[in-house]
Curated annotation (Swiss-Prot):
Keyword field: GTP-binding, Hydrolase, Metal-binding, Nucleotide-binding, One-carbon metabolism, Zinc
Residues engaged in binding Zn(2+): C89, H92, C161
Gene, per the UniProt record: folE
Enzyme Commission designation: 3.5.4.16
Name of the protein: GTP cyclohydrolase 1
Lineage: Bacteria, Bacillati, Actinomycetota, Actinomycetes, Bifidobacteriales
Length: 199
């Protein structure tokens, strides 16, 4: 089992809304702002509510998302393309966004509902993240919890930590991939990639 997935399953993660409010007030003071001024006085509450949503994946379980199957026997590729994703870079706590393409060869006992793939992307995107790990976690979860015989995941994202600060290259997109099981076969992988790239 993926070490990070395992640690998430074993830990009971909770969300401390008041702690987030206090941290935001301290942050505003630390950058030289007045958290009591008009325009900022409700900002700690707003950010605390937003963070509950942005980091909801910390309280979610991929096993729960992938537990149900439909009784359909197929050994062909199932691919859902262009799943929108929004996440937060764990290095700068700035957003990155883009799309995920998720394909799998189902387990013998059936296929998943297509929405399950989008929900799985959400579980891992809604937490402090790096794109490389996000891509791998989605692939590993499909093998671990859905019994997929083959998996391919490709993500394409723009990182605001690279667009609005630092090198400031707003047109740059990062592409990462993870391939597992039967989709490591060069011919099968090539077929999957041609479907992903076909716009």
């Amino acid at each position: 089992m993926n070490e990070y997935i395992e640690s998430c399953q074993q830990e009971k993660r909770t969300y401390d809304e008041e702690g987030v409010r206090e941290a935001v007030r301290l942050f505003l003071k630390s950058i030289g702002e007045d958290p009591g001024r008009e325009g900022l006085v409700e900002t700690p509450d707003r950010i605390a509510r937003a963070c509950r949503e942005l980091f909801a994946g910390l309280q979610a379980s991929p096993a729960d998302v992938l537990e149900k199957h439909f009784d359909v026997d197929t050994d062909e590729l199932v691919l859902v393309k262009d799943i929108e994703l929004y996440s937060v870079c764990e290095h700068h706590l700035l957003p990155f966004h883009g799309v995920a393409h998720v394909g799998y060869i189902p387990a013998k006992d059936g296929v998943m509902g297509l929405s399950k793939l989008a929900r799985l992307v959400e579980v891992y995107a809604r937490r402090p993240q790096v794109q490389e790990r996000l891509t791998q976690q989605i692939a590993d979860a499909l093998v671990e919890y859905a019994g997929a015989r083959g998996v391919i995941v490709v993500t394409e994202c723009e990182h605001l930590c690279m667009s609005m600060r630092g090198i400031k290259k707003s047109s740059a997109r990062t592409v990462t991939s993870a391939v597992r099981g039967l989709l490591r076969n060069p011919a099968t992988r090539a077929e999957a990639m041609s479907l992903i790239l076909d716009k």
